[in-house]
Amino acid sequence: MLDASEEGENLRTDEILGLSKLLWLAGNETTTNLISNGVVFLLNHPDVLADLRNDRTLIPDFVEEMLRYDGPVMGLFRTATRNVEFRGKNINKGDTLWLLFSSGNLDADTYEAPETFDLHRRNKDHLALGKGIHFCMGSALARLEAKVAFEWLVDLLPHMKLDFENGKRIPVPILSGWVKLPMSVDVGALEV
């Protein structure tokens, strides 16, 4: 980033800091939240956990459906680049908009039974990783990290207990995940 330039101009310090913060947040926070949301889901849905334990080839499908069903990012802010009317409402150039990916991921016009988690859902498209020029540049790494984590976790989860009463959700409406989620593992029951 220090050497990057466009039309002979280098990035400013504030742009470098902003991009660095984005890379850190997007590359860590979101994958962590995807995995923690998936752990909570699997502990609350032992039938899905059993399916994954019996057929690990379903883990990539599980990751995609988790991204759609309870993704780590609820939405992001965007700035309108021009005046536009949308469904009878005026949006002015410069207005700040909050795009709710999570709402789009539950669109009944796009998904059959959108509020139901479906491990075998045929339409695997979702907005959790953005679209177009705003598509997550770390999406392949995030998917791989989640896949590897769940390949290991499906054997550990039957021996885990979460302490929801002492857990704490992320208090920021943009993100979906946990700040704190205490757990215990019955290590004596684990196969080494």
Regions found by a protein language model. Name each.
Residues M1-V192:
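Cytochrome P450
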